[in-house]
Swiss-Prot record:
One of its GO terms (molecular function) is structural constituent of ribosome. Pfam families: Ribosomal_L30. This is Large ribosomal subunit protein uL30. Keywords: Ribonucleoprotein, Ribosomal protein. The gene is rpmD. The keyword Ribosomal protein applies. Belongs to the universal ribosomal protein uL30 family. It comes from Prosthecochloris aestuarii (strain DSM 271 / SK 413).
Length: 62
């Protein structure tokens, strides 16, 4: 496993999103615009980000 992390920032509100997208945002630890979390860079996290890619911004950390 790599020790790389990604920083996920919520840039848009979840108003008008589907239930699946709202649940994904909550499971990532986000909830309001400008909230940030750092998660390990693995396929599971990348899959969650892909579901809500129009709501979040992703930065790779070293």
């Amino acid at each position: 496993m790599s020790d790389k992390n990604i920083r996920i920032t919520q840039v848009r509100s979840i108003i008008g999103c589907t239930k699946k997208q709202k649940a994904t945002i909550k499971s990532l630890g986000l909830g309001r615009p400008n909230y940030q979390v750092e998660k390990p860079d693995n396929p599971c996290t990348r899959g969650q980000v892909k579901v809500v890619q129009h709501i979040v911004k992703v930065e790779e950390l070293s």
